[in-house]
Every structure is written in C-alpha cells, then in structure tokens.
Amino acid sequence: MTCLDPKTIWPNEAVPNVRYRDFSKMVLFTAGDEDQFERKRSYKNGTNPDKKVSLDGNIWTNLFVPNEGLETEFWNGYNLNASSTINTFDYMFNKFKKGIFVKIVDNKVVTFLPFSKHGYKNDWGDLMKYDPSKYKSMIDFMRHVSNQTAIANNKNYKFKPDQVSRYTNQWYSNNCLIRYEHPLSEGDTNVVTLRHMFDELCATREVPDIELFINRRDFPLLTKNGTEPYYNIFGKDHSLDSKSLKLISEGMCPILSMCTSDMYADIVIPTHEDWARVASTEGVKTHVGDKENNENSLPKKITFPPQCKDYSKDNFNTPWEKRIPTAVFRGGSTGCGVSSDTNLETFNQRLVAAKISYNSKPDKYNVPLITAGITKWNLRPRKILNEKYLQTINIEKEAPKVSPLTPEEQSKYKYIINIDGHVSAFRLSLEMSMGCCILLVKSKIPNETFGWKMWFSHLLKPYIHYVPVKSDLSDLIEKIQWCRDNDEKCKEISQEALKFYQTYLSRESILDYMQNLMVKLKLSFPTNEIVYGTDPLFIQNSVQSKYLFNMMNNSINPIFPFLTPYLIPKPIPIYNILGTSLRGSYGWSKGYSMFLKHMFKPTIPKEKDNLKENANQNERKLNEKLNEESRVFTENQQENDWEMKRSTINLKGVFEKRLFENKKSTVDLYSISGSNVVKKSTSDAQGMIEHINEAFISDTCINNLLKIIPNFAWSFAFEKSLNENGVEQCTLLNEYIEGETFSTSIKNKMSYLGFSSGKPFKNVLEVLFQIILSIQFAQEQCGFIHNDLTPWNIIIQTLKEPITIQYPLFSGIYKIITKHVPVIIDYGKSHVATSPYGDFCFNELSVGNVIHYGVVNMFNMIECQDVFSIILYSCLDMLTVNGTKFSQRENDETEYDEQSIIKMLNFFSPTELKTRKEALSFIYQYKKYENLIKAHETINLEKSPIEFIKYFTSIFKKEKVVYGLSRLDSKRTGLIMDFNNPKQIFDEAFAQNIQEVYISFLNVPQNLYKCTLPQPKTKIELYMVAQLLIKCLKDTLKDYRIFAEKSSLRKESFHNDIIKFENAINFITTFYSKEISKHGNDSWVIPELCENNQIEISRNYFRTTSDTLNYSIKPCTDLTFFKKTILNILNWTDDEGLFEIKAEDRVEISTQLKFVLESTFKDKKISANNNTYIVYKKYCNKKYCI
C-alpha cells in the first residue's frame, strides 16, 4: 500500500513558508498573514460559472437535511459572493486563528490554502484565571499540570516555565481546551487527507464553481443567533463582538466543519478519518501513480501522512455468537469535563464510563458487563462553562489508566460504547463497520436538545442503528443488561449498522454527499456565482508597465547610432560627500536618466511569435551594454586649457560587486560611463510588481521631489525582459547612495564620521527630523507613503561642510542645517497619488485625474504610517544598543536616553508607556510587517508627520536640533539641488566633440524662439509658466558659465553667448509681463476643471456577470496640482525680482483661493449589490466635491 507523497502530488503547495520559522512542520504551504493569503489564493474565473450540475444517481439527493425544520437547507446568513469570502477569512483568521480556504473552478481545485495567523491574539485572555487558594501563580498552575501529566502517562517531563506564554491573550483554544505553549507548535495534521478528498471529488464528480472554508477545529465556529461559539469560555448566550457581528451581517461564505449542532451554522462534511478509512479499504482513483485516471480505472488503496494509517489491516469478521457479551470503550480523556462525579457540572462522560467500569463487578460467569478505560491522559487546562478558574483532571480521584485495544480487538466484543470527546467521536463511522451493537451516549452540551451531529447523524435511528444512553450515563449498566437480555435484537442492530455503513459511509457515498452539498449550496443563495473582476493591483501594474514602456520608447532619439562613443559629463555635485562618490544635481540626474533610457530602450517585435526571442535579445543587449568596454572622452590639458581627445578606457568590466542576492533577486553595483549605478533584478512575481511600482513612482513623483530636497534616491531606468533561462524578469537602474544605513549608525551610537561625539540621541533626532520633513513634503506633493520605511532603508550621507536644506511645506518653509543627509531608498511597496500624464495641466488628462497607485494598502493613505514605522524601529535599535540596563543618569549623553525613547513612542501609544518593558512590548506588538501595515486599525495614524516634530520639540527642550521656519531662499535651494537643463545634458551625452557640447548649450535659448509659447488664460497659470521658463534659462546659464571657464572659451564668444541668454530671458520677461498685465484686473481663479475625471474602483473582487455598478456620486475634482502650483508661485524668489508675487496679490490669492489652500484628504465609498467599492482618496473641497 502506498503512502501518498504531497511533494510529488502538489509540488507547488508542499513548500515551506520561509517567512515564519515555526511553520516548518507544515506539509502544505500555510499562509501566516493576510498578505500571504491574498497572494496565494486564486482569482481565476470559471469558463461557465452558471453551469447546471445534474444529481441523477446521487443517493444523497433526497436525504440531505443539514438544517431540519428550517425553510431552507442552509443558514440564511451564508452567501456566495466574493465579499463574503473576505468576511469569512477575516472572521476565522482573526478570531480562531486557523482554517482552510477552498476554491473550485471548472471542476478543479484551484486553491486549497491552509492558514494560521502568526502573532495571533485572542479576545478572551483576561478570562483566564487560576485558583489562588491552590496555586501561587499561573506558572505554578501550569507546573502542576505538567507534573501531573508526566506522572499520569509515565513520562519524564521536565517543566520549563519559559515554554509557557506569559501573555494570556496569545493563547488559543478549541472551545474549552486551552493551548498556552511558547512558542506555539504549528502543525497541519490531516490537511493532506482533506486536500486529496477534494481532488477526488473533482476528478470523479461534476461540481459547480464555488468558494468555501473548512474549519480546522473540532468545535464549530459560527452560531445562528450571533452568540459566541466558544460558550465554555464566554458563557452561554454571550453576544459576539461588534466586529464579528458586522462581518456576519454583511454575509459569510459557507464554513464546513466535521461536527456541528442545531445551534451552529457550520455545515457538516465527512471527517478526515472517514476519507482516510475508505482510501485504504476501498481505494481511490486520483494520485495513485497512474498517468491517467478515468471513470473505468480501478481504485487503488493509499494512506496519508504523517501516520500513513492502514485501516484495511483490521479484521471485523468475528461471528456474533463468538463475541464477548461485554460493552467496551477505549479512548483518551478528551472532552471539556474534568471529573467523573455526575453531581458536578464539570463531569466528563469518558471519566464517568471509566469509573463505572472500574467499580462494576463481573457476572456469575466472571464475564464483566463493561470494560471501559482511559488509555491516555489529556490534562490540558480547561475553561468550563460557569467556572471562574481554569480546571484540569485530578487523576488521583479517577479510575487508573488501562491498556489500549486495537479496533480489531474491540470488535471481538458484542457491544461498543461511543462517547463524545471534545465533540462527536469521529470513530463512529468505523465502529458501524465492526459488527458491534453501538451504545451511543447522548451529547453533554448546554441544551440537550442540541446534540453534536456528524454528516450522517440525522439518518441514524435509535434501536435500529444504535442503543441510546443518557448523557450522564446513569442508565449505562441498565442498557448493557438490556442488550444481554435482547441478544437477537442487538445482533439485528449491529447488522443494520453495518448495512448503513456499506450504503452511506462508503467512498461512493462520501463523494455523492460532497457533490450534493456543493450543488445545493450553489442553488441556495441569490448570488450563486462568483466572477472576479481583474485585481486592481494588476490593472494598476499594467497601467504602470504601459507608462514605463512608453517612456522608454518616447525618449529622445539622437542623431548618432547606438555604438557611437558617448560623453557623459561628470556630475555637478549638489554637495561634497565624505567618500568617493558624488551625487549629481537634479538636472544632471534627469539628463543621465534620459541617456540610460535611450540605451536600454526596448524594441517592439513585429510578430507576436517573436516576443520571447525579442525579450531574450533585449536581456542580452542589456547585459552587453552594462558590461561592454565603454568609450569615453578623457581630459588631457594644461591649466586653463581643455583639449578633448578621444581615447578608450576599460571601466573594470563595469560590474563592481554584488550587494545582495537570494533565489529570485539580485542587487549589483555597476559603473556606467564613470557613474555608479545599482542594478536590481528579480524574477519573483510579487517582486516584479514592486519593481514596476518603484520605477513608476520614481518617474512620476520621487525624481521630481529631488528638484527641491536631497532625501530620496533617483531611479534612472527600467527594463522588463526574459533572463537566460527564459524566465521573465524586471530590472531597475537606480542611483547608488554611498554611506551606512541609519540602522548601522544607531547601533554604532551615531559615531560615524562627522557626528557630534557623545550625543547619540541628539544625532538620531537630527536625522529623524529630516526624514519626517521629507515625508511630509512628499505627501503634500504627490501623496507619497513609503510603507516600508525602516532604518535599513535609509542611507546616511555625511558631508564635508554643513548645508542648509529647506522643506517648503504647506504650513511654512522649514530649514535644517546639517552635515548628515538621510537618503530614503526602495519604493517597491510605496504609494503615490499622481497622474501618469505629466506634471502640468497643458492637456485635459492631467488635472483632476490624479489616481492612487501602490502595492500595500492600495486605497488607504495613512498619513503617519511612515513616521510610525521609522520611530518604532529606531526606538527598537536604540533600546537594543543600550542593552537590558536602564539608563538612570539624566546627564549621561553617551547612551540613548530611554525615557526620551519612551516619550517618542507615546506619540502613538493609546495608553501611556512608562517603563522599558512596556515600550518593548508595544514595539513587538507591531514589529512584524503584517502587523505594522495594519497598525492604523488599532492606533491613530491619521495625524500628519509634521505633528510629530511639533510634539517632540514641545517636550524635549534640551535636545536642540538646528531647524526653523522662514521664507524660501531660492539661492540656497539652487546651490543644493538645482543645476543643468536635462535636454542639454542629454544632447551633451551624445556630442561627438567639444563643439557639439558647446552647441548643446546654445540650443537652449535658440529653441525658445522656435517653440510656441504657452499662453494660458488665468493669472495663476501665467505666473507658473513664466517662473518655470525663467528658472530653466537661468539654471542653464549657470551651467554654461562653468563649461566656458573649463574650456577656455574665447572671451568674445563667451560675451556674445551671455547676451543670447540674457536676450532670451528679456524676451520671456517682456512677453509674460504683457500677458499678466492684460489680466491684471482678473480674479485669482484656478483653470477650468477637466470633465473626464476618473473614479478608480478598489480591488474589484465583487462583480458578478449580472452586476452593474450604478452610482449617483459625482467625480471628486482633485485639487492637489492647484494647491502645489499656488504655493510654488507664492514661494518663488528671483535675484532680479522677476515674476515675484506682490504683497497685495498674496492677500487676494489667500482669500480668493482659500478653498484650494485648505483642501484636505477625504474618502469616498460606493455600494452596489451589497458589495463595497472604495473610491481612491484625493484632495477634495465642498465646492468641487459633491
């Protein structure tokens, strides 16, 4: 007999979850967080979701009555739309920790996904109490349980206090049975068996498309009346929490359990024991080693890991007359009770049976009436209904343990007692095949009319299939004696039970039952089909990919062929860094980016069949470009004499070193034309989504921020191709930032070059303030949220001399004087609100169509998410550096002040933290990424980043960080960030000689006369265009002066060229001054709003084929662009005062455009057919948002 090998049958599912080490024992991949669940489950639609399935020949068609007496066969709170799937996962995952999601499409199991919440926290921990009259502490009680278990089972257990979780809200339960181990031992026993049962169902029966959940607990999970299902913990008729009630009210996906009762909505299915039994006794058709399985193939017998139990070995053929007239029971001490005393509410039916057997005497022939006993003690703590304290079995008061008996040995008795354990004893179906007369003990649960039921229980009839026994077993001896007195009747009952087994508990019957269940579920609800729209994450990804592809193909085409040697001018530094690297200015970076995009521009295949080959060629071309010997111009000159000579140099093979590598991703450092570039490549599906998102966000948002502030890294170019193995991959070329990570700096107590010695906390604040100000600026400019802002995603660059960085926020201009510049990297998980069509409203597609893009929390803009993240991890690093000793000395500036750290955390904590232990507990509560990104659900993160700085400076008077509010200084800003004209840089890159470099500068003013100047109709737009053109000309003129000085240009030519630039500036000044004068009496208004505003729907899981989205809400006009434009215009300064806004105009603008300047973020939601569609956030104002 073959024991099934999951790795062979389901190679893509039988893989470890590398994210969680304690999931190592799982045979099938088990999702440990919501992100993994969403990624692993299928969103595939069936080809015929409305197909009708015939039940002709199905023996369960007229027998299936899961909710006898109700109008419908199923609880009416169930639904089959996809929002119900989300609700049910939320309910099971967060409240009960475990479950399995099953999705069947086109008669195949496309998703079988176990899940178990890592970092689970319950809502009943405060109800777990020990008896203080017996035990000193909870640990003392657990020590007692451990010692008793060791004695009872003859084991040499050694109690270890650190293996008990000290936090009761981290325990989990199976109704009354409590698990408290630390760390929790995760497992997936019997999951493989259930996986195979569903595969066999789809292979041998026609079933509809459907989504379901399987309960992995013994106890059912969902009551029909909205009360807590775990009544032993909460008490009888205790209402569910408000969140659970809300989820249930919105609709639940069917939950399949192996046991239920009339008080529960769970739908019963055959147990894993049922399927394991028939697979080994009757055989199955799927996964048995045959290449093909069909209806005519013979079933083959298999077993399932980890036990690989073979039920076919048992021989139940002992004739009735030769069986012993004794009632037998063997089993563990499972169940909620802890005593054999039936006078107590805490009695345990199995302990009662064992005590009855222990005290009973044999008959006159020395044949016992009963042989019942416990074979293994389960002393796990119980929380029992109406009991205040946790309980466990006192083995000294119970009958002693007895030797086990195999099923075959038990079948030699005439009568067999079936007693519930935690719920119904799953062995009942096996016992019905043994030829014994079953004594079935009634369930002991709060209301005896609600007995535990399995999938076939409603077909069983007393004195036909079994002999009933009262729940307290008070008539057990009487019933055994009745059996002896009615031997023929009991023989008949045993034979009827066997017939029932052969008819209804066979392999064919199990599959018929499951088919009948699927079909009737599908027909029982008004929404009987699930048709997924395309996941907006992939819609977004395709939009971003198209944008990036167009940007690559629309890059400027130079005159010269590709193999022409290039001249990339050396970066004009924005500041001098301690080290070997230079950071290029905004203009240089823009031009360098254009150069790289042209180099790696993909070619469009003429034929579809050539796509793969073309992608391979692109990949080879990319590597060739990165690794070829680059031909560049070098300088060979005397002082003040620049003679450009062509020469060829080898850039060390271009490849410098590998920075990072795993199975699916690499990060390499390259040198391209003398500049360091980071090449990031990945073939992982989620990694590619994040790479595309990073490239898109950089191009539409981050790179533009570098005009003003230096706290972000530039992304130059993007490529999507196939690697050498034919696997699709994405490649990013990003700016290389030299320095150490913020995390390393903190751990080194900020002792890196240039930091103030002995003042680590002050130095941390200096960095944090810059990070927070840059995040605030990025949010205001383009709705940027990093979503993974940690100290290791920030590089600290230390400068030779201090610089002043200005952050022009909506609330004012903040200045920081510093030698330490934090640069934020890695935007794969980030979010922006941007338009892929450009920055300026020169076409109707720009303004009002700002859409939210992102991978994490796609449709949520959580303003303080990044601040919370960086503060949380920075505090953890600081506390870790300090070690376990608490810093008591107030003036000890060589250590991180822990009281200050705690105060930082109190900005977020809903309850005041006072001690190091409380601070660490708060940090570890959110430290895991899946908890971090959901933190907004439990704490207030709707504050703006700047509020943290205001909070911190108000309580930390002694920590003086040099920053303040002022008017924007354009001169200082220009010296830090603004140099060059990107078009001129690009032209210079492809210049063949110094003459062409020279021409690239002169083309800037000359091209001005060849173009049609924009002539907008509002004063706001006129000022914006004029300021931008003046800035472009003056920045290029500054760069030209540097070039002229280095190239020793003739003075006459130099002066003539300066005149050309000045004439162009005068031309722009005259032209726009007249245009502004024409509109001098006009009001200050924003341009006419675009009519074709979009509404982006969130993850569109919820549409069915018949569903149409009807909404009466009008699109919300986005005011982000206008707000930024107005503030930029107001903050504009010029050496000559050109186009500066006058004081009286400032007053008018602040009054007439107040609604724009005061616009805030706002959510909008739409509902259709009970399905919630989330509209993206945008800047709104009542005047423009209805």
Swiss-Prot record:
Task: Tell me a Gene Ontology molecular-function term this record carries.
Answer: protein kinase activity
Regions annotated as coiled coil: none
Q: Which is a Pfam family this sequence falls into?
A: Glyco_transf_90
The record's annotation in InterPro entries points to: CAP10, Kinase-like_dom_sf, O-Glucosyltr/Glycosyltrsf_90, Tyr_kinase_AS
Q: Sorted alphabetically, which PANTHER family does this protein's record hold?
A: GLYCOSYL TRANSFERASE CAP10 DOMAIN-CONTAINING PROTEIN, KDEL LYS-ASP-GLU-LEU CONTAINING - RELATED
State the protein's name.
Uncharacterized protein 179R
Q: What organism is this sequence from?
A: Invertebrate iridescent virus 6 (IIV-6)
* Taxonomy of the source species: Viruses, Varidnaviria, Bamfordvirae, Nucleocytoviricota, Megaviricetes
